[in-house]
């Protein structure tokens, strides 16, 4: 964010906000399909006699993309502050779409894993860049809701993966369902035409005239001619980001964000990968076990909007902590012999208390740090959280292959949810230095 003393209030026009939301929604939807399809096809991969994979090997195969996402999040998040958020978002979608096509033809698990790792680089970069663009082009009083709306594309993508797998897996096999992940390549030209560049990036690079022209097209208000990058060395993004995250006054917040997202993504990726398999082990057939993934995804999508609105009204910190707790309790309750209807309800609460809570927490994080470090700080936090994402499928695979009852999977994931809730509850509140209200007035506001 450019210092208040040197910048006239600028507010995005509704058309610009919705355009950015739409493009970022598409990018996140495609990512959700890529991530969700592995869980949807996992039972078919387990039955593939050509590869004969063990449960632990299946979990490892699922984790290759997550390793790539670890590197992609902080590399691309930081690079986007140097070479442009718009360019990096389009590049990331192109990369993971192409590798999905390649993975569908992989002759061996090793080649499949390499392609998934490369695609993971693009997957890891989408979230921090889309988060930064969405927060930047949203009015402050709508940030959490808009972020929830944008990120609901992730759950819609997972839902599409589950529905497509239920419909086409018997006829196309797992290779055909994975190959459909290349479809986004067709929409890249449309996304490139619609998506504006980040004003924060342009100003941070000293491209003031270009930033002003874009500001005139996408919003209301002017950048004064004397505007300069907020930091004294516009291209010293690395030093600025490190200072923004690890200064003494920010250290506790950074630690809490990172720990909460670690356990949050352990939940998200562990449940996305193993929920159909665990429910199948509990006596459900393949179609019924996949239906739990559908419920999980639907609830996550709707829950993101609900939590976003609640966070805008009551504060993100308390809202996210509460729903992590609710999700943990719901996951733990799945270990009991419940009716199908009760299990559907519990899975829905688990979706809201894992995916929805994590996405609202990511949006809160993106607004917590200075604007010039928004994408990079989000990327660094998500990179650390990828250790949790990588652990989720492996933990589920270990428990599934250990001979323990299926209930131990739910106990393990429930503990992760409790840890995430505690970390969010320990987050310090922060004050945004300047918020532009609906009337265009500037005031201090606490981020709760």
Residue ranges and their predicted role:
Residues 170-181, 401-415:
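A membrane-interface helix-boundary motif in multi-pass transporters
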Residues 115-152:
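Cytoplasmic helix-loop-helix junction between adjacent transmembrane helices
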Residues 71-109:
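Conserved MFS/SLC helix-loop-helix module at the cytosolic interface between two early adjacent transmembrane helices
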Residues 39, 248-304:
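Extracytoplasmic gate region of multi-pass secondary transporters
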Residues 84, 105-111, 139, 315, ...:
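Helix-breaking motifs and short loop linkers at transmembrane-helix boundaries and internal kinks
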Residues 1-9, 194-253, 435-448:
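Intracellular cytosolic loops and amphipathic helices of Major Facilitator Superfamily
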Residues 1-33:
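Cytosolic juxtamembrane N-terminal segment immediately preceding the first transmembrane helix
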Residues 39-71, 288:
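Extracellular/periplasmic helix-loop-helix junction of adjacent transmembrane segments
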